[in-house]
Design a protein with these regions (language model features):
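Conserved AdoMet/S-adenosylmethionine-binding subsite of the radical SAM
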Residues: 1-109
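C-terminal accessory extensions appended to soluble enzyme cores
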Residues: 80-84, 90-154
Length: 154
């Protein structure tokens, strides 16, 4: 049986944007407990946010993940970048002041705002490269077109 765990994002993203949620350490500890009880886990890193020092932040996240968990019990790793509807953006901005929406974005075929494809490809490629330092894993991209998968997961 597989249990999924969402790490959401790097510590810097959780601290800045994900109020009242568990820290990355708590999330990894929960995943470790599942593994200790015999479960394989699926890991999801979503949303990946284009923050300053993004490469280091997500590299640190992958290092924490891979050195804290039994990598032989990680079934797959899913990656997804920030995407949202215009309605969600309006709701968030009503509730709090945030710089989350300051990046240049494009409206996708699904009507959701997301980073330009070149930015998404670069973000995913950097993270995949960090993951592959620890071995071969089944990696997938959530909510992405085939051509993005082909560029990133060569």
């Amino acid at each position: 049986e597989i249990k999924g765990i969402s790490l959401d994002s790097a510590s810097e993203v959780i601290d800045k944007y994900e109020f009242k949620t568990a820290s990355i350490i708590k999330r990894i500890e929960a995943a470790k407990k599942l593994q200790d009880h015999g479960y394989d886990i699926g890991v999801r890193i979503d949303p990946i946010i284009n923050i300053q020092d993004r490469k280091k932040a997500y590299s640190d996240l992958i290092e924490k993940l891979m050195t804290s968990l039994d990598i032989n019990k990680i079934r797959d790793i899913g990656l997804g970048s920030l995407r949202y509807t215009k309605g969600l953006k309006g709701k968030v901005l009503k509730e709090r002041k945030t710089d989350l929406f300051y990046n240049e974005l494009v409206t996708g075929i699904d009507g959701k705002e997301r980073y330009f494809k070149g930015i998404r490809i670069k973000m995913y490629s950097e993270i995949v490269e960090d993951i592959q330092k620890y071995g071969e894993f089944e990696i997938y991209l959530g909510m992405e077109e085939d051509y993005i998968w082909k560029k990133v997961l060569k």
